[in-house]
Amino acid sequence: MVTYSTFIVIAIYLILTILISWFVNQRSIGNTDFSTGGRQFGWFTAGVSILATYISAMTFIGMPGWVYQSGMEALNIHLNYPIVIFFAVVFFIPVFYRMGFTSIYEYLEHRFGVYARTINSVVFILVQCISSGVILYAIALILIQILPISIVEAIVYITLFTACYTYAGGISTVIWTDMLQSAVLIAGSVAIFVLLLLQVDGVHGVSREQLNIINLQFDLGVDTTLWAGVVAVSFLHMSVYGTNQLIIQRTLATRCEKTAQKSMLLCGYGAFFIYFFFALLGVLLSIF
């Protein structure tokens, strides 16, 4: 049931986002600030921003739903973080940071030429349009349950609002609003977790199979095995943490190379525990 408190939370969030955008815009110095934020951010702020970037509304909705259907085995695809983060921190971040680039596509032009930069930039934009479309749709599905608007209107409003505050302050606004979004996400998740615990009458409805995390099957038709997570998904996560512009751009906004590496460590190892928490929500929902 939608209450006045729901609208109050949304209003406060929108107001804080606008204030952050205005404040950052007033402090903006030059064009480089738009892409790197003046390289002023600490490891915690940048790390939380990376987490908020990678863990979107799809995670909030999708991970509990996946565990609800497949059990805790869904966590297998996230067991590769120690391997992936090691390579990202040791081999990728130092190269991008030391060369002073504002994007990974500058490195592609430097290393392979302008055609490599252009092609990869276009592909990245197309992929992000598809990915962002899915995320926007997921958020809009929630928003139309609260506000008397259609799903098309919800998508348009979210897109325009996000584009405006991003354009006003660049990466600095994005990072600080990521902090705000993370706080809202954590508060909401914890509230749901507590409410479910209060409503659930014991764990009698949970089977051993649902709680089992490690799946050692060699079945290529199952996507929640340990081998799928450690071997196959490692390459996917390597591209995400090592060469994804959305992730790397935030590390390039930090004060120094060591700070950039620490921010990636926070994101990588923090992400697993967040996914684990959402997995527990899925278990609770299965017995709710």
Task: Describe the role of every protein-language-model region.
Residues 1-60, 166-169, 182, 188:
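Membrane-interface "cap" regions at the ends of multi-pass membrane proteins
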Residues 1-3, 36-41, 45, 62-76, ...:
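Loop-to-helix junctions at membrane interfaces in multi-pass transport proteins
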Residues 16-31, 91-105, 164, 168-170, ...:
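Juxtamembrane interface elements at the cytosolic ends of transmembrane helices
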Residues 17, 52, 75-167, 232-240:
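Helix-loop-helix module between adjacent transmembrane segments
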Residues 22-27, 93, 129-136, 140-157, ...:
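Hydrophobic alpha-helical segments and their helix-loop junctions in multi-pass secondary transporters
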Residues 31, 72, 114, 151-152, ...:
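Membrane-helix interface/capping residues of multi-pass secondary transporters
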